[in-house]
Amino acid sequence: MASGFDKLSTASKQSFEDAMSNTGFGKFNKISVAFVGFMLLGMISETLGLSYIIPVCHCDLKMTPTDKIWFSSIPFVAIIITSHMWGYLADTKGRKKILCFSMVVGSIVSIISSFSPNLYTFAVLRFTCGLFISGPSALGYAYLGELNPISHRDKMITLGNASVILGTAFVPLLSWAVLPFDFNVNLWFINYRPWRLLVCIFALPYVICAFVITKLPESPKFLYAQGRIQESLKNLSYIYSVNTGNNPSEYPVSTYLQFFFKHISDGRKQGILLRKWNLFKVYLHKKKYILMIFLIQGVTGRTRGILTSDS
């Protein structure tokens, strides 16, 4: 039996969390945290990567110091605009489907942006890319948490989040390795230089993750909350099989206790605008909101200073 598989009740009718715990803890959970970690690494690459691209692309794109400043904010503005939309879509359409869609479109647009002939084309494409990379940045933690039993959930989310910290080292190291190359491929509308190649490389984590997620199951908790009981149990039995090496038919839970999450169905009735308004009631969480702003500034602010420097 897989390591971490705790001794639990084998009753066929259980609450969702008990049913999730009965899947054990092993190979699948390690795959899930590696996947989400790599996906979050892709998000960091796409957002912070511009910090290292702007100083070397300013000649090709004829950027002024002012252009460098507003251009650096593009991915963050796009993420802020669409993060709640992706949450709403994930609650109504499914985590897996929305993650796959956003990563496919985001990576394609990012690669296309490397061929931008001028600043404004590059800005529009990077903004569009930011709209879609917001999906994984908003949903990755939820998806990871819903694929792991409650006894290990906090630990797995913490491990997944470590990739964000690693990303702040990965991005400059990759830039240091690629940008010193001296090549200039003359295409009919652009000169293809190392910074354009770096843009494509930063998109690779999403390309890889978009393929990998097709092999992973939809969140059993989402399916459960939607009332799709048999699909949820099927995914739980798959996780159980990967973790334990047993046949999925040996999964000890055959049905759930009758309890459903009402917040998702209520959210569909409310609509995205009302749900956004509820999230923006800052006065209800003023202290937490202020603390969050300081933390975000600490994480991102220290990487922005190089934006106005020239290569």
Report the location of each language-model feature.
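Transmembrane-helix signature of 12-pass secondary carriers
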Residues: A2-Q226, Q230-S237, L257-S311
